From Swiss-Prot:
Gly residues bias spans: 1294-1303
Region (Nonhelical region): 231-443, 1571-1605
Descriptive protein name: Collagen alpha-1(V) chain
Expressing tissues: Widely expressed. Isoform 2 is more highly expressed in liver, kidney and lung.
Single Gene Ontology MF annotation: platelet-derived growth factor binding
Signal sequence, renumbered to the chain: 1-36
Domain spans labelled Fibrillar collagen NC1: 1609-1837
Similarity annotation: Belongs to the fibrillar collagen family.
Native organism: Mus musculus (Mouse)
Amino acid sequence: MDVHTRWKAARPGALLLSSPLLLFLLLLWAPPSSRAAQPADLLEMLDFHNLPSGVTKTTGFCATRRSSSEPDVAYRVSKDAQLSMPTKQLYPESGFPEDFSILTTVKAKKGSQAFLVSIYNEQGIQQLGLELGRSPVFLYEDHTGKPGPEEYPLFPGINLSDGKWHRIALSVYKKNVTLILDCKKKITKFLSRSDHPIIDTNGIVMFGSRILDDEIFEGDIQQLLFVSDNRAAYDYCEHYSPDCDTAVPDTPQSQDPNPDEYYPEGEGETYYYEYPYYEDPEDPGKEPAPTQKPVEAARETTEVPEEQTQPLPEAPTVPETSDTADKEDSLGIGDYDYVPPDDYYTPPPYEDFGYGEGVENPDQPTNPDSGAEVPTSTTVTSNTSNPAPGEGKDDLGGEFTEETIKNLEENYYDPYFDPDSDSSVSPSEIGPGMPANQDTIFEGIGGPRGEKGQKGEPAIIEPGMLIEGPPGPEGPAGLPGPPGTTGPTGQMGDPGERGPPGRPGLPGADGLPGPPGTMLMLPFRFGGGGDAGSKGPMVSAQESQAQAILQQARLALRGPAGPMGLTGRPGPMGPPGSGGLKGEPGDMGPQGPRGVQGPPGPTGKPGRRGRAGSDGARGMPGQTGPKGDRGFDGLAGLPGEKGHRGDPGPSGPPGIPGDDGERGDDGEVGPRGLPGEPGPRGLLGPKGPPGPPGPPGVTGMDGQPGPKGNVGPQGEPGPPGQQGNPGAQGLPGPQGAIGPPGEKGPLGKPGLPGMPGADGPPGHPGKEGPPGEKGGQGPPGPQGPIGYPGPRGVKGADGIRGLKGTKGEKGEDGFPGFKGDMGIKGDRGEIGPPGPRGEDGPEGPKGRGGPNGDPGPLGPTGEKGKLGVPGLPGYPGRQGPKGSIGFPGFPGANGEKGGRGTPGKPGPRGQRGPTGPRGERGPRGITGKPGPKGNSGGDGPAGPPGERGPNGPQGPTGFPGPKGPPGPPGKDGLPGHPGQRGETGFQGKTGPPGPPGVVGPQGPTGETGPMGERGHPGPPGPPGEQGLPGAAGKEGTKGDPGPAGLPGKDGPPGLRGFPGDRGLPGPVGALGLKGSEGPPGPPGPAGSPGERGPAGAAGPIGIPGRPGPQGPPGPAGEKGLPGEKGPQGPAGRDGLQGPVGLPGPAGPVGPPGEDGDKGEIGEPGQKGSKGDKGEQGPPGPTGPQGPIGQPGPSGADGEPGPRGQQGLFGQKGDEGSRGFPGPPGPVGLQGLPGPPGEKGETGDVGQMGPPGPPGPRGPSGAPGADGPQGPPGGIGNPGAVGEKGEPGEAGDPGLPGEGGPLGPKGERGEKGEAGPSGAAGPPGPKGPPGDDGPKGSPGPVGFPGDPGPPGEPGPAGQDGPPGDKGDDGEPGQTGSPGPTGEPGPSGPPGKRGPPGPAGPEGRQGEKGAKGEAGLEGPPGKTGPIGPQGAPGKPGPDGLRGIPGPVGEQGLPGSPGPDGPPGPMGPPGLPGLKGDSGPKGEKGHPGLIGLIGPPGEQGEKGDRGLPGPQGSSGPKGDQGITGPSGPLGPPGPPGLPGPPGPKGAKGSSGPTGPKGEAGHPGLPGPPGPPGEVIQPLPIQASRTRRNIDASQLLDDGAGESYVDYADGMEEIFGSLNSLKLEIEQMKRPLGTQQNPARTCKDLQLCHPDFPDGEYWVDPNQGCSRDSFKVYCNFTAGGSTCVFPDKKSEGARITSWPKENPGSWFSEFKRGKLLSYVDAEGNPVGVVQMTFLRLLSASAHQNVTYNCYQSVAWQDAATGSYDKAIRFLGSNDEEMSYDNNPYIRALVDGCATKKGYQKTVLEIDTPKVEQVPIVDIMFNDFGEASQKFGFEVGPACFLG
């Protein structure tokens, strides 16, 4: 029985409660229950009462108690115990409390020093712990890291590991921690934590040890509680663990919930304590917790000796129990209110406990006779037997018996109940409870208190010193523990006896043939099971590793579930097997494959600490994570279609100052400046008079294309044009001819394991059958894919006139017409109802930037993006060895456009240029601010007199209205005069590459260049552009029909390759394993037809085969007969860009166009002849710092410079060991363009070069003369839909409609678009002056208007004060008809009117922008027969055919085509180094190669200057998953996982008697074809780490049902894979996939490896956390890690703002030193810990560069007072005075003379000191002193 948690005993004074009146008074006084400081019982949460491994029961603190015949129960914990739980279980609802108590009754093993409990956060950092032993330590570290390890509270002079029982209470309150030992000694220590400390509850609680700590708690423990109240510690010996001689503690007590569970005979009455209940005195009104059990109070206080009637010392209130307490609670509520001492003895009130009708409300006294009676009892003072259940309920002289009450909360207590007991009280009346019919209390007299012992001799102990005492005597045997949790299912029992025959089976399902199974034999020993339920042997790490490998192999070898087989004969029903004995809990098995996510299970008990599982399968997608780090920039994508204009984004933060913008519009004329300096050479003057005609010039460059001419006649097809821009992705082309084989490439690296291959290649084609008869016309097929555009057809005959079309879109503006006469003013129409929202128009031209909008709300966190495309090349890596000089690079691409230069001084004003041609209409500008008030205009010309309107009634004079909003912008004015020519700007930065220019003329073919050297294989290029259609091949012979393939996905078009030379035939390779399925091969050449064999006899009907894989497209068939005309197909997609046609004849000169947008900067023209030297331009602004370029090619030798001054002495470099000569490095990176060399002398005139490539497009030539009028062109193709035209001119006014009824008041509509201007109204009153507007841009030049007749001047209005804007009024009554009003504002668009008459045919419009996709049109007319469609999906299986006659043996077939290549074999062992071949002739320079892999470590170069501070690189892409590493050491148990998947099906029982035959199932499909068995054994090995299930299906495709031998090939391949993998585990290669533990390990396996960078994984396990280090095999196999860039050191300086004697991390520019691997990634703490564990010594050098500053010894005084101090990784300070392992290799700084350096070496066997993390410098601060330092790598030697 479990007593480690609670005590219960009858309390004096409880007799008072037997009075119903008093109970009623207490009920009256009951306040609402407040929340308890409920203790968290760690022993219960860790399942101690089920005795996990390493835990046994023993006698507790008290061997006897006066109130009990049984000893206390405790638990003995051995070193085998591994107990942990999630911290969340301690405090599931809230965080860890700031102030709390830890209470424990414990007897530690004598002389031990171990942590009793440790709490870790989510990162694995210990945040709380209690270490028992001499000088116990309370470890506490909050979320800020306070206090540090040196400030942990230490309690010296106390020995908790003396082999005796101790009651220890720790109270943590604010910044103090108090230890109360054995209820007597009290010590308070300062706890330097932050004001609001946080202990993370997302980690784990470990009992008895720490992670990676050898010391494990051993001893006995009775109680371990966490209480969220710091005051609980002071009451520990009163409320939680009372003295043994306490007969009746002042606490309620109760019997153990179910003593029979542990003592079947009913013996053993044990008290256990109910936790006290602390109440917050400041919060009396909290709601009761849902799990309170109000009934319990009345019972708990009823067992009282009759003679004791003193008042209650502490009255219990209604408890609040957590789930953990519920399991042992009966009806007790003996929890304590923690109240101030004044209130401490006041009896607290009670709530209405709900005894049926007995207590209806607090205001009425309870009738003892009604409802369930209140149980009462007195203590029996003589040893009488318990009365039978049910007796003595009303008799105070008998003993009270309580009844078992069913639990209302989902049978939570059911395991504790006696199901046979009576229940006289219904559960609804009382609530959950427990039997207490065995409480018999014997009151004894306490013995005299023993005398105080003599004071012991003081111990002379230093902190941390351990003195082991003799072991104490063996304690008495513990009580039997409670039953354990249900163990795992035992092993399958023995087969039962033969059962009766089973029933007839159900009809069998349609069976599918399963592929033959595989058989796998592996030479590993597994833990064999013993008898049923016995525990298997432990498995060693190597075996478990092999098991993990085997598990992988099993998973890989296991194919997908085979199809359901035919129904077998039913076996006989066996009797149930004999039940196996309950086994011990087995070791945790490997994690199974992830099942479907189940519903959340109930909170499970915490499991025992298990081994670290292997990595689980990929989980279900989690919730959207936070936005990830920015990935590398991807490769530039293909240009997308122009998107819709986005909404204005939120206003961003102010950017960094941008480059100078483009020149703005001309400002207003400034004041006249001072006379400027003479300007630079002016522009050319005006054009002079034409000179005499010169001789005919040479043929000029092609001019710009002239204006569009009329369509010419159909020309002959031109020669193929140059390569156009990439078109849209085309459809797959037809099968091309097979090119000749390329040269044999170099052997590639072994690839990664491939994905499962597709289905295998199709079988050999069958013999060609006789041609069938022509079939009947089939139904029209489905819409085929859109074919390629055919060749341009001959012009067809004119069609019949079509139907009248619908009204066309509004045409573009025509030429301005002549001004018409003024029309009659129409009546004002009513505003029509708002029309439906029209479709979005085409995207308008890009407007000028609007003002920045307000910032929008932040959007929701987006999902983390998918992995991007491979990024651009990464940041430069660590400087590699100097490579050989690379080939000269190609000229780089044009740089980006430079920032605009500062404005130059104004040049002299140029003469006015000729009037430019009219540009295209510009985009509509933004509405400007109102301009400044203009001067009073002159009288305008009088307009023509209008018709006289009817006289209106005289209206009252209105008040001046408020200032109206700015009116809609007027129509664009007529074009103004062209502006003056602007000043020439400075040369801008080179712009970004412009868009591809117009295709130029075909250049002459250049001479064939010399053959280049073979380059390295390039990376896969982007999808190539669409190649030109190949020439039609000769018509092939009719091929055999291929199997129907599945439609393939569109692949990206590849670059068109050049045919390579035919390679020599390679040597014949060894016979490979059966390869995985290769890609579909090209169709082989047609074989010569064999002789026709005699007809065979009909074979049996085959089962339908599996659908074959997609075959390659067959050769083109013969042209079929034209089909019937089909329905009109949907409109095809835009065709590909056609070849550029021949230029048509010049058309007539068109009218000048409107001003065009400013064009993009054109590509540079051809190199002009050398110009005169220009005058010195003004200096440009300093450009931004560019990246440091690679050295350019050597410039020409300069003139010798003047002799420089004497330089400072350089530092002496380290003397490195002589390395092996490295092999020549790969070709280096292409260098950045070097700085321009000095101008060379003019070279000799070269010979005439070959014709150059076509130059870029030249400047626009002069317009050619008008050509003769060409003949009219044919009707062109309809143009694409043009952009939406400008609004047309207003049409004639329509007839007035009939007046409609007055509609209801509509909602306020959205602001409509500006309507057309109304006719001029009478002049309004003069408005207030407007704000000054910006100066408008000059309008385009207008055409002169007709002069109008002079108008009459209007009357001048008076200025009225602006009124406020009024609210909208309600609509008034309909008034009498007013005078004719002004035209109203334009209403919303009306309904579409009927189509008007067809207008005259407009001019040919220019091609518009691409329109939006239209609706799907009606079916078109049947087009011509398209190309052959992709094969359809396979149809359903046909019916089984009738067996044909057996055929005769056919003649041998012709040899089949070559089979697909087999899979790549495993990498062979490294071959011997071959002799170097003779030096070949120097080849031509090759193309620039790819960035090569890093070369081997070169000799140490001279120290470079310190580089500038680099920015931190972006987070790298996730690496590929490495192979599974060996099993690591067991980690701490993780949080409880989700429910596991359903277990595997058990083995089958013995065969039963035959049942009745089932109905025959449907026939299965045909099996796969047979296959020839390869000879065994197979020599080759395979490199794939696991075999894909899909490949197993393919490989097994030829296996029959009976012959299982074919699967052996796969098994032997797997065994070879495993053999290779185990070989690599024994002898790791130091690669990322196969890392070694340390460099020493690597050297032992491969003593011939050179020094260099290798991958290590000190903690083994999964290799994904391996890291790259530098292995110094020359130094015996050291493993070296490097300081990161910021920790490598600091350049020499005087450090004026820092203080001597402070750590470098406290400097303003300082930091703690951190270390990275050879790739710059930080090395994990765990990996460094393992690396230290595997090392015997470590060393590290630090170089101190000084100027008159001491680093180590001061030679002047001979002292080391100013020596540098180091802080080791274990936070230990190291210097000359306390560490003999530091020595100075060079101590040049000792003399304090000039620039020197001191090299200090730390070579220590205390590997935990290295690497150093901080440095203290002590000698600087004077004006003449400077220092810097360099930190070397930290190297560990095993």
